Amino acid sequence: MAHMSAADIAAPTRAASNATQQGVAGLPASNLTAEARLKASPRHAEWVKIPWGDGKADSLMAWIVYPASPNARAKAPVVVVVHEIYGLSTWVRGVADQVAADGFIAIAPDMLSRVRGGPSATELASDTATKLIRGVSNAERSNAVSAAANYAMMQPSATQKYAVIGYCWGGSTSWYHAINGGVKGFSAAVPFYGLPYTTGGTPATATTAAVAASISADSLAKVKVPVMMMGGSKDARIGAAMPAVDSIMKSLKKEYSGTNYEGAVHGFLRAQDDPKAKRDEAEEAANLTATKDGWPRMIAFLKKNMSGK
């Protein structure tokens, strides 16, 4: 599980939405602007229930968003958007909406569907989601991504290629899916501030050196798709451990890039416009700079690796 500082693990809050509070055009919504962005979105989105896998009776809840293409015959690749430890929040659905705006079919599965007692479109309180997420197994994480990808690729408007992007816990899930190979069509992974599968994990009190040492080269050797990782230098654990990931992936000659944005914090995409009461001006500026640079780079990376049918 991804680790955060005490300041960053605090439950996110949202300001009241209004039509003028929609954030920066061409970038995903922040935590403060997601609700307004979703209400104003011209794209078709809906809740769907899908089976976890073949023969599975229980359902996985997911939010799917389709791009508004001027060409009715155009098909789009799929991007699975994996949420943070806070569950499938309004903010994550806002991210999915921007992914669709950039030309992909975006699907965000609720990885807590089983542990919360069944599929539901009701957003969980952050503290509830944080407690429940510890009950989601690694196998469930990868299976849910595969189930969401398969469902989206079955849609008439989809190509047969998909990528997975994730944040915090979802970033680690993106790594785990890459290590385990995914399903047919898996083409790329983009973990934001989430570490790869480790040799048994590390406790929250572990030092940065211990976290870095726990990253398994044997696990990373199994990665077959291009990976783009992004983090922030002020993330005391994940940002500090990124050089170890970079070194291993380079030694394995994997198709990989890692960017550790100077001054940005854990969760910088969500926190891109946090109020000054929570962030100082330098952090606020660094988070927005990281978002403005990282998002278009990610979109270009996804398009490059999922071009064609």
Give the positions of each predicted feature:
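Gly/Ser-rich "nucleophile elbow"/oxyanion-hole loop immediately N-terminal to the catalytic nucleophile
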Residues: 73-76, 122-167, 305-308
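Active-site glycine-rich loops that stabilize anionic/oxyanionic intermediates
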Residues: 76, 82-87, 233
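Short amphipathic alpha-helix adjacent to the substrate-entry channel of hydrolases
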Residues: 90-116
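Cap/lid segment of the alpha/beta-hydrolase catalytic domain
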Residues: 112-139, 270-280
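Primarily recognizes the serine-hydrolase "nucleophile elbow" in alpha/beta-hydrolase
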Residues: 145-222
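C-terminal catalytic histidine-bearing segment of alpha/beta-hydrolase fold enzymes
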Residues: 255-309
